[in-house]
């Protein structure tokens, strides 16, 4: 780690404390994040963990070197919701072909959407259907060790059997007892379960449903439960390539550094992942640090289709933003709206709940417009290294304090420190070189406008406002409007300070 980079500290849901991050192997830093179930358009709540952990991925690459960080984000392409969508959308196709159409088209849309949000591609994106062998092998190991059992062609994991053994306890992540978890959980009641809290590792496929050879001596075809998929895929991508896995008896080699996802996944999904992986691999921890982002609301309400406020990422990208006018290049429009959405989300710390509003999205687009305008005016070039991003890096090293990082970007803009602004934006995934260099983007088509002169007149107007000389402040506003420049006043949500932006009109 470079001496100029502060110690990275991350909040660990497992310990409920902010911890200094110490990778198991600084040359092989490894992170796993639960990805999408590809049956429908991803909504803006799905976008939040993608953005949050992309920022962490960028920060880890900055600190340890891009070649030393592996980021795995899975794709769930085996699920009852996928089956239902396939039957609905393609009733005339053979079922497996219909499922393939749903998963391939939905995944392609997801990849396009999250790319528009400014995210890097993860190092690997394993698909559940590609790792059935690992799932079966892990299930067989769990049965052999007495923490899973076969019943009516199902294989189930027994939390009570896990807790009867020496080693990690079920419930350590959620910090709840089995009775407390049962009281607050929605569990499937089934006669073949020994205990209500037992959960499915494998289940038989019905006629016509996709199915694979089953583990544990079961003769019928079946398919995996949701939780075992992530345990198997993280093992395949973050343990086995580095000497871990089912053939390894070294507990440290069977752990990776960071596991992330939304707060809604703490229980049961992540709790069950830990149980499966620890019991199968003989380790105390599946991952050393568990990170979870907070919930998202829309205009102060829970997002739901029944309330009519269900917003997909594609909705945000398609709506565009007024700065681009009638710009016909959909890719460019997507990327501009995506960057604005990214900045909007990063203005709330990842562990806090976020309130998505159209106003904040528009304000974020305005702020990006100002930042890019300065970079263009000063001829900023895409940086090869981020040697001037220290203030942003320091903020992000404090448990991804994105608000403090954005404050650093605002300060760099205020003092016209172009290197700090541009490199800091790059570290946060807010820099698209196209918007810095392209000459044909309507948002920056201001050849006849002197941005520096306008900034000076805005500063003069603010001085008049502070002196309560309203007549002179209005005079400057009206003169600029006559010249085709419209001013817009707003307030910094954190400081209350007046912010004035401008745009060309007429």
Swiss-Prot record:
GO terms for cellular component: cytosol. A motif ('HIGH' region) lies at residues 36-46. It is an enzyme of class 6 (ligase). One of its GO terms (molecular function) is cysteine-tRNA ligase activity. Its EC number is 6.1.1.16. Gene3D superfamilies: Cysteine-tRNA ligase, C-terminal anti-codon recognition domain, HUPs. It catalyses: tRNA(Cys) + L-cysteine + ATP = L-cysteinyl-tRNA(Cys) + AMP + diphosphate. Coiled coil: none annotated. One of its GO terms (biological process) is cysteinyl-tRNA aminoacylation. It comes from the Bacteria. A motif ('KMSKS' region) lies at residues 302-306. It is found in: Cytoplasm. Its cofactor is Zn(2+). ATP binds at residue 305. Keywords: Aminoacyl-tRNA synthetase, ATP-binding, Cytoplasm, Ligase, Metal-binding, Nucleotide-binding, Protein biosynthesis, Zinc. Binds 1 zinc ion per subunit. Zn(2+) binds at residues 34, 230, 269, 273. HAMAP family: Cys_tRNA_synth. Belongs to the class-I aminoacyl-tRNA synthetase family. Monomer. This is Cysteine--tRNA ligase.
């Amino acid at each position: 780690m470079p001496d100029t980079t502060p110690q990275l500290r991350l909040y660990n849901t497992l310990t409920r404390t902010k911890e200094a991050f110490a990778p198991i192997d600084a040359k092989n830093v490894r992170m796993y994040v639960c990805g999408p179930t590809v049956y429908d358009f991803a909504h803006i709540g799905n976008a939040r963990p993608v953005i949050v952990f992309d920022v962490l991925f960028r920060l880890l690459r900055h600190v340890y070197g891009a070649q030393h960080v592996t980021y795995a984000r899975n794709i769930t392409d085996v699920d009852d919701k996928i089956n239902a969508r396939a039957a609905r959308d393609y009733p005339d196709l053979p079922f497996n072909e219909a499922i393939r159409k749903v998963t391939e088209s939905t995944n392609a849309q997801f990849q396009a959407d999250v790319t528009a949000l400014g995210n890097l591609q993860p190092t690997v994106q394993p698909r559940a259907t590609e790792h059935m062998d690992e799932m079966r092998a892990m299930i067989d190991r769990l049965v052999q060790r007495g923490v899973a059992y076969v019943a009516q062609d199902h294989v189930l994991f027994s939390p009570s059997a896990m807790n009867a053994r020496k080693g990690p306890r079920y419930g350590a992540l959620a910090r709840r007892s089995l009775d407390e978890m049962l009281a607050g959980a929605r569990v499937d009641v089934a006669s073949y379960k020994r205990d209500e809290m037992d959960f499915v590792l494998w289940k038989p496929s019905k006629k016509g449903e996709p199915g694979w050879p089953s583990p544990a001596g079961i003769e019928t075809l079946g398919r995996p439960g949701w939780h075992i998929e992530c345990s198997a895929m993280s093992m395949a991508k973050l343990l086995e390539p580095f000497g871990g896995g089912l053939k390894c008896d070294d507990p440290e080699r069977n752990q990776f550094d960071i596991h992330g996802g939304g707060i809604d996944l703490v229980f049961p999904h992540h709790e069950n992942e830990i149980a499966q992986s620890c019991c199968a691999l003989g380790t105390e921890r599946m991952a050393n640090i568990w990170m979870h982002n907070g919930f998202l609301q829309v205009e102060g309400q829970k997002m739901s289709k029944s309330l009519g406020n269900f917003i997909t990422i594609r909705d945000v990208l398609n709506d565009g933003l007024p700065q681009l006018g009638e710009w016909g290049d959909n890719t460019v429009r997507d990327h501009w709206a995506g960057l604005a959405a990214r900045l909007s989300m990063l203005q709330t710390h990842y562990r806090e709940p976020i309130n998505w509003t159209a106003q904040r999205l528009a304000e974020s687009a305005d702020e990006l417009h100002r930042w890019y305008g300065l970079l263009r005016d000063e001829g900023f070039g895409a940086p090869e290294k981020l040697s001037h991003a220290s203030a942003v890096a320091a903020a992000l090293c404090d448990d991804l304090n994105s608000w403090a990082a954005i404050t650093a970007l605002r300060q760099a803009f205020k003092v016209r420190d172009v290197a700090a602004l541009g490199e800091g934006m790059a570290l946060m995934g807010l820099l698209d070189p196209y918007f810095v260099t392209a000459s044909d983007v309507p948002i920056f088509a201001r050849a006849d406008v002197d941005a520096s002169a306008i900034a000076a007149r805005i500063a003069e107007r603010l001085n008049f406002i502070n002196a309560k000389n309203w007549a002179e402040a209005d005079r400057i506003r009206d003169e600029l409007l006559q010249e085709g420049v419209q001013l817009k006043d707003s307030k910094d949500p954190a400081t209350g300070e007046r912010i004035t932006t401008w745009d060309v009109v007429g």
